[in-house]
Amino acid sequence: MVVLDQPAQSGMVVALQANYLEVELDQVSELIPSRLLCTRRTRLSHRGEAVYVGDRVRVEAIDVSHARAVVADVEPRVSFLTRPPVANASTVVVALAVDQPAFDPDQASRFLLTAERTSLAVQLVLTKTDLLEPEALERLRVRLQAWGYPPLLVSTFSGLGLSELKQRLAESSLSVLCGPSGVGKSSLLNALIPELDLRIGSVSGRLQRGRHTTRHVELHHLGAKARVADTPGFNRPDLPDDPRNLEVLFPELRVQLEQHPCRFRDCLHRDEPGCGVTRDWERYPIYRRAVEDLLGLSRPSRGG
């Protein structure tokens, strides 16, 4: 039966299931289940107000016997990621494999650019480190540090780095774990939270692409106060709309501009005469291609 005299409860959306929202309540009670399957108030839809995993919400009309309720209001968000869609995250963890699938600098940069666009803390994690010889792994670590991302090296096979990763995730209220398919995100979460027992996929030998095992965003507890969002893998994040926004998304370019500001406000740091940006950093060709791609997309097509 619906408990009409129960006061409204606050909680967090921890998963989406078809047209339903799974909400975990803040206050544990013997009278009310800790998790409720909820619909949305019609007025939220009329206002065009979407509800996402990570949203803080108020639920009412609680049906104790069936663990159902209705989301009545959504609290203002402190942050929002568009892909994967997660509200109120504090850290973005980009997971990239050193092998199987092979490390791809262009793909890695796309994910790091997407993470930088959130203005949240970014942590780079290299997975499957047991597949590389120590010398090769050290070269990759130094390389990524030069990009501006000191990586955390982990292996679910040897256990390398798992304790440090768990500690760092526990320091963030909500971390979003993202990365290409097949890099081992589900394996990582299984190692960090064994009771999850998430399904693990494999990597296509021909395409070197992982097979999606996570189908939707879901939050999992990691310690008393921290949560981590498991997200579906995808292989080609989008670039920002405006090429002028790219310069703040590359840490190595940001450092250059802080030390030696370019005298041209609208400079894209390509071949502009007098541009003070040097070209002797590894990802400059990636930056350059991204600018060219965006300029190509922004040009109006000429009809015949």
Curated annotation (Swiss-Prot):
<keyword id="KW-0694">RNA-binding</keyword>
<keyword id="KW-0862">Zinc</keyword>
<feature type="domain" description="CP-type G">
    <location>
        <begin position="78"/>
        <end position="237"/>
    </location>
</feature>
<feature type="binding site">
    <location>
        <position position="262"/>
    </location>
    <ligand>
        <name>Zn(2+)</name>
    </ligand>
</feature>
<keyword id="KW-0547">Nucleotide-binding</keyword>
<keyword id="KW-0479">Metal-binding</keyword>
<dbReference type="InterPro" id="IPR030378">
    <property type="entry name" value="G_CP_dom"/>
</dbReference>
<dbReference type="GO" id="GO:0019843">
    <property type="term" value="F:rRNA binding"/>
</dbReference>
<dbReference type="Pfam" id="PF03193">
    <property type="entry name" value="RsgA_GTPase"/>
</dbReference>
<dbReference type="GO" id="GO:0042274">
    <property type="term" value="P:ribosomal small subunit biogenesis"/>
</dbReference>
<comment type="similarity">
    <text>Belongs to the TRAFAC class YlqF/YawG GTPase family. RsgA subfamily.</text>
</comment>
<dbReference type="GO" id="GO:0005737">
    <property type="term" value="C:cytoplasm"/>
</dbReference>
<dbReference type="InterPro" id="IPR027417">
    <property type="entry name" value="P-loop_NTPase"/>
</dbReference>
<dbReference type="GO" id="GO:0003924">
    <property type="term" value="F:GTPase activity"/>
</dbReference>
<feature type="binding site">
    <location>
        <begin position="127"/>
        <end position="130"/>
    </location>
    <ligand>
        <name>GTP</name>
    </ligand>
</feature>
<keyword id="KW-0378">Hydrolase</keyword>
<dbReference type="GO" id="GO:0005525">
    <property type="term" value="F:GTP binding"/>
</dbReference>
<feature type="binding site">
    <location>
        <position position="269"/>
    </location>
    <ligand>
        <name>Zn(2+)</name>
    </ligand>
</feature>
<dbReference type="InterPro" id="IPR010914">
    <property type="entry name" value="RsgA_GTPase_dom"/>
</dbReference>
<keyword id="KW-0342">GTP-binding</keyword>
<keyword id="KW-0690">Ribosome biogenesis</keyword>
<feature type="binding site">
    <location>
        <position position="275"/>
    </location>
    <ligand>
        <name>Zn(2+)</name>
    </ligand>
</feature>
<dbReference type="GO" id="GO:0046872">
    <property type="term" value="F:metal ion binding"/>
</dbReference>
<comment type="subunit">
    <text>Monomer. Associates with 30S ribosomal subunit, binds 16S rRNA.</text>
</comment>
<comment type="function">
    <text>One of several proteins that assist in the late maturation steps of the functional core of the 30S ribosomal subunit. Helps release RbfA from mature subunits. May play a role in the assembly of ribosomal proteins into the subunit. Circularly permuted GTPase that catalyzes slow GTP hydrolysis, GTPase activity is stimulated by the 30S ribosomal subunit.</text>
</comment>
<feature type="binding site">
    <location>
        <begin position="179"/>
        <end position="187"/>
    </location>
    <ligand>
        <name>GTP</name>
    </ligand>
</feature>
<feature type="binding site">
    <location>
        <position position="267"/>
    </location>
    <ligand>
        <name>Zn(2+)</name>
    </ligand>
</feature>
<dbReference type="InterPro" id="IPR012340">
    <property type="entry name" value="NA-bd_OB-fold"/>
</dbReference>
<keyword id="KW-0963">Cytoplasm</keyword>
<protein>
    <recommendedName>
        <fullName>Small ribosomal subunit biogenesis GTPase RsgA</fullName>
        <ecNumber>3.6.1.-</ecNumber>
    </recommendedName>
</protein>
<dbReference type="InterPro" id="IPR004881">
    <property type="entry name" value="Ribosome_biogen_GTPase_RsgA"/>
</dbReference>
<keyword id="KW-0699">rRNA-binding</keyword>
